[in-house]
């Protein structure tokens, strides 16, 4: 009778171990699928924005879960003490999503209101959200235009800021607008303002806001930018770079 109970117990234990192993295998496969789906989403977004002015591609890293140690509880062979029986891996997970800040290619547009930055830095934008809250955001997209009041604005109508932090106001009757490599703006040869171009000590302290804009988070430290302003150009992401994470 005792031997039968022991046999049944052993069978039950083996069945439980098989089911446990099957579940672990399914979970490992699941985490792999989740990782690949995230990578596909990122690459698809990069490709969709390959011609978006000032867009910076994203990438993802993969890392394995920490190993889990298996323990046999109250092992009779060692005085009913817990016994380590090995370790197992539960697959991989997304480590982090990062953004590449490499310089993109410049495309000539011959528009006096298109500007591309060569080097590190961002245009400063006064952005008002749907709740009516206004804050300073940043962009690499220099496709601007002049509104009816003479202010330099983004394609969405947000004000472009000068180095003083105020919106850039242009004379509406000016026939020629020129900008030098430092970002100084001239209308018919007369100085008007200078682009408020800023850079950051650590890009880990800026995050994507949406609409091709970025915002500084707590701890962000700004610094002067040495970026060169190119009038009549826009900055694009290389299409091949957009897909090189595949």
Label every PLM stretch briefly.
Residues 2-241, 245:
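Amphipathic alpha-helical polymerization modules
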